[in-house]
Amino acid sequence: MEPVAYRFCPSCGGRLETRLLKATEPERPVCTACGHVVYLDPKVAVGTIIRASDDQLVLVRRAIEPGYGLWVFPGGYVDQGEEITSAAIREAREESGLEIRIDGLVNIYSYGGRSPIIIVYRATALGGELCGDDECL
């Protein structure tokens, strides 16, 4: 996914231009009017590898891009101000219909040139009925 090209300053609305501020850092958008530096922060996403009561893993089939039609474990973006584990529990409930318990951290993943940092948890299904939402086939 290509990064978004920002053209205007979020502080004053002035024109942005790309500048090299430090030799050891990437070029950054800087406002020509007020000097505000725009830092393009990564998004944080969570995923849960859920063990069901019959020792099977829970997967959902994506109904949206990217990855339409692919089988994945439940996950999604963390909302601003939301605790990471709360986001993992919410995404699991929304995408699978299951209430879960977070059992531990699997790993944290990031890939060069891509925005999301993905935090993956191990979880156990506690209840609910397996069903998908509008993001799942």
Residue ranges of each PLM-predicted region?
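Nudix hydrolase/Nudix homology domain
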Residues: 1-5, 17, 66-68, 112, ...
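Acidic, metal-coordinating catalytic segment for phosphate/diphosphate chemistry
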Residues: 2-48
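Short connector loops at helix/strand junctions that flank enzyme active sites
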Residues: 26, 41-45, 66-68, 73, ...
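Conserved beta-strand segments that form the floor/walls of ligand-binding pockets within enzyme
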Residues: 30, 45, 58-59, 72, ...
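Residue-level signal for pocket-adjacent positions within structured domains
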Residues: 33, 66-68, 73, 104, ...
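A sequence-level detector of short linear motifs
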Residues: 39, 58-59, 132
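Conserved Nudix-box catalytic region and its N-terminal flanking loop in Nudix hydrolases
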Residues: 51-94
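Unchanged
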Residues: 78-137
